[in-house]
């Protein structure tokens, strides 16, 4: 049985695509997972994948701290190289982040092929520096190839949970009716500024007969103890929902940040969207992620602004009062973002 090592650690943006890909594989593959102690993967990675934890960090701080971290990186790379030989790993799949660096270097020492997946339109630091040492780099957004001229790249899309791939009925708590269904995804960090923009236009949306599901994120406490402000039958406010596949499959419009995870979920579910990039994202990658969807007419970009301005209100009103939503839906349907897992597996098969 061939053995695949998956190296994914730290944030959901690194872990969830790797989990989705792992779950798509048949039982003919044995999977070993390489992570970091006390990080999110300890909670998320199921027991059926053998999770091995390795202490590693980024190159941060002053020159002396960076030299110390560099020594730790080289030591970790040697550890990975030994591990790969001990576990008789055939091929590696990694999604970037701190754990990827020693994994890529260790694989180079051991002569084991590596497929690196990059979800964002602007590759992360590890991808830019070490992508050239990988046998292939799979891209979630095709424009990322512009930054990886020395790498062998292919556009595959980013894996999502299988639940996003099939039609699903709406949860019972979503307002019933014929009105346009708008799903607002505030993000796990709260997206407080974006939520403020959306709250300002809620009266307009309700007046136009829209049904609104506002997922604020756990850090936005505006609605707590303000039940009178979320009591309209066509408005549902929640911190989060684990039924995102059903919500996006049935939504007429999403209002969202433009992280890589949100982009791939919107693409797979063919959901037209208004994207509000987080202005402080690393390298402004959310702006370029959003530009990918806007380029073929699947999304409209609205920069974060003072809620008192009417920019978001005017754009939403225009969408609701015209055929633009229908045209955006057609554009989404005509854009191929299907079967990322299958495309990634084909690359893994070709390099292993």
Swiss-Prot record:
Signal peptide: none annotated. It comes from the Bacteria. Keywords: Cell cycle, Cell division, Cell inner membrane, Cell membrane, Cell shape, Cell wall biogenesis/degradation, Glycosyltransferase, Membrane, Peptidoglycan synthesis, Transferase. This is UDP-N-acetylglucosamine--N-acetylmuramyl-(pentapeptide) pyrophosphoryl-undecaprenol N-acetylglucosamine transferase. It comes from Prochlorococcus marinus (strain NATL1A). It is an enzyme of class 2 (transferase). One of its GO terms (biological process) is cell division. It is found in: Cell inner membrane. PANTHER family: GLYCOSYLTRANSFERASE, UDP-N-ACETYLGLUCOSAMINE--N-ACETYLMURAMYL-(PENTAPEPTIDE) PYROPHOSPHORYL-UNDECAPRENOL N-ACETYLGLUCOSAMINE TRANSFERASE 1. One of its GO terms (molecular function) is UDP-N-acetyl-D-glucosamine:N-acetylmuramoyl-L-alanyl-D-glutamyl-meso-2,6-diaminopimelyl-D-alanyl-D-alanine-diphosphoundecaprenol 4-beta-N-acetylglucosaminlytransferase activity. Cell wall formation. Catalyzes the transfer of a GlcNAc subunit on undecaprenyl-pyrophosphoryl-MurNAc-pentapeptide (lipid intermediate I) to form undecaprenyl-pyrophosphoryl-MurNAc-(pentapeptide)GlcNAc (lipid intermediate II). Belongs to the glycosyltransferase 28 family. MurG subfamily.
């Amino acid at each position: 049985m061939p053995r695949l090592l998956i190296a994914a650690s730290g944030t959901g943006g690194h872990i969830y695509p790797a989990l989705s890909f792992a779950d798509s594989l048949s039982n003919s593959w044995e999977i070993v997972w390489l992570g970091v102690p006390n990080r999110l993967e300890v909670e998320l990675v199921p027991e059926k994948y053998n999770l091995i934890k390795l202490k590693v960090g980024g190159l941060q701080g002053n020159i002396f701290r960076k030299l110390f971290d560099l020594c730790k990186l080289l030591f970790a790379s040697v550890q990975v190289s030994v591990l790969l030989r001990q576990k008789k790993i055939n091929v590696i799949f990694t999604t970037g982040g701190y754990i990827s660096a020693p994994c890529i270097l260790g694989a180079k020492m051991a002569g084991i092929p590596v497929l690196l997946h990059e979800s964002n339109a602007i590759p992360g630091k590890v991808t830019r520096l070490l992508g050239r040492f990988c046998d292939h780099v799979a891209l979630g957004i095709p424009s990322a190839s512009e930054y990886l001229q020395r790498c062998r790249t292919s556009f595959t899309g980013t894996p999502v949970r299988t639940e996003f791939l099939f039609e699903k009925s709406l949860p019972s708590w979503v307002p019933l009716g014929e009105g346009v269904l708008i799903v607002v995804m505030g993000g796990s960090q709260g997206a407080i500024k974006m939520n403020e923009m959306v709250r300002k236009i809620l009266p307009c949306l309700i007046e136009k007969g829209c049904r609104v599901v506002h997922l604020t994120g756990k850090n936005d406490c505006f609605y707590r103890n303000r039940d009178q402000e979320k009591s309209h039958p066509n408005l549902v406010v929640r911190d989060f929902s684990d039924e995102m596949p059903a919500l996006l499959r049935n939504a007429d419009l999403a209002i969202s940040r433009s992280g890589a995870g949100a982009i791939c979920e919107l693409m797979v579910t063919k959901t037209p969207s208004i994207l509000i990039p987080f202005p402080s994202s690393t390298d402004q990658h959310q702006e370029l992620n959003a530009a990918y969807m806007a380029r073929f007419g699947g999304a409209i970009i609205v920069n974060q602004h003072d809620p008192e301005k009417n920019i978001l209100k005017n754009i939403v009103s225009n969408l609701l009062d015209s055929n633009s939503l229908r045209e955006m839906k057609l554009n989404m349907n005509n854009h191929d973002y299907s079967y990322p897992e299958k495309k990634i597996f084909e690359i893994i098969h070709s390099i292993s």
